[in-house]
């Protein structure tokens, strides 16, 4: 059975506190509780949390300890100093090395196909089941066989500001061809529009466009690929933007696609995504989760 794991980033647009640990449910649940519940229901049997060492105690108190009673849990720590031999962390750099490095931290504890998700996104039951079913019925052959769950753009926007989304390009076999990052998408003029110049000009975009919410299914082969690509990334990044450059997971996938060494099956979810990009999003998410409980999808007390 496959592993699930989560990565923890710290949100810059959400004022104050660690937004991934913000309480959303009536009994102190956070978004992650629901994701883990859905993952376990789907068949996943292990959770790996990728966190910063300095939040370990808070993290265990808020969620880790109660999850540990339900499913096997591992912790790995993303550390800025954990880089390949021959490289030095630039003076003044405080930012870790991005989602690629985060996933690489799991190399020692992940032994089978696994799922990567954001800690602060609510993905919905269907997404976990679909990705579990794919991971347990496919393995690498002449290509790495990866997968991702995509959402309709209209199901992933907020009324409270702009969002960044990865727009998916697909081929006829529903495999990923490209992910184009659009960093400013918002609801405007009764539709959805994006801007590439900080809001000076806007372009319409189809609300049914498929977007990535960073829900990826991988075989262990990705871990070797991330490791192999890290030095080349640092070589370039440290010259161009030493304090801010990040080794992004989707960039590793894009390179493998460009070299025709991987195929990424795009699975669709019709579920509505929920997340807290802005403080004002919180009541909407709290209400959505309560109505899912009322409909019977979740018990009122998740882990009792």
Residue ranges and their predicted role:
Residues 1-5:
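Short, small-residue-biased leader/transition segments that mark boundaries at the very start
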Residues 11, 122-124:
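A short, conserved beta-strand element in the Rossmann-like catalytic core
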Residues 19-34:
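Short catalytic helix/loop segments, enriched in acidic residues and glycine
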Residues 30-49, 61-62:
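A short, N-terminal amphipathic alpha-helix
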Residues 112-122:
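Short beta-strand-to-loop acidic/aromatic patch adjacent to the donor-nucleotide binding site
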Residues 125-215, 220:
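Conserved core of the sugar-phosphate nucleotidyltransferase
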Residues 226-261:
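A C-terminal functional module that forms or caps the active site or interfaces directly
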């Amino acid at each position: 059975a496959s592993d699930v794991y989560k990565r923890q980033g710290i949100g810059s647009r959400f004022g104050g506190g660690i937004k991934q640990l913000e309480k959303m449910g009536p009994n102190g649940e956070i978004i992650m509780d629901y994701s883990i519940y859905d993952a376990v229901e789907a068949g996943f049997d292990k959770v790996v949390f990728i966190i910063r060492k300095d939040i370990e105690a808070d993290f265990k108190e808020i969620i880790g300890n109660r999850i540990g009673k339900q499913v096997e849990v591992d912790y790995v720590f993303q550390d800025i100093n954990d880089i390949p031999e021959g490289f030095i962390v630039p003076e003044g750099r405080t930012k870790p090395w991005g989602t690629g490095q985060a996933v690489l931290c799991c190399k020692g504890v992940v032994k089978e196909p696994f799922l990567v998700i954001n800690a602060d996104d609510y993905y919905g039951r269907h997404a976990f089941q679909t990705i579990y079913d794919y991971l347990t019925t496919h393995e690498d052959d002449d290509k790495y066989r990866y997968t991702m769950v995509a959402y309709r753009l209209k199901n992933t926007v907020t009324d409270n500001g702009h969002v960044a989304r990865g727009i998916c390009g697909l081929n006829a076999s529903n495999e990923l061809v490209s992910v184009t990052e659009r960093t400013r998408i918002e609801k405007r003029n009764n539709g959805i529009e994006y801007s590439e110049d900080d809001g000076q000009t806007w372009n319409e975009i189809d609300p049914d466009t498929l977007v990535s919410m960073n829900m990826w299914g991988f075989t262990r082969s990705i871990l070797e690929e991330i490791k192999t690509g890290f030095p080349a990334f640092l070589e370039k990044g440290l010259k161009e933007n030493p304090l801010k450059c990040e080794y992004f997971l989707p960039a590793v996938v894009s390179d493998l696609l460009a070299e025709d060494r991987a195929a990424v099956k795009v699975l669709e979810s019709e579920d509505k995504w929920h997340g807290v990009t802005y403080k004002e999003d919180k009541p909407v998410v709290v209400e959505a989760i309560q109505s899912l409980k009322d409909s019977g999808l979740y018990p009122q007390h998740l882990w009792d």
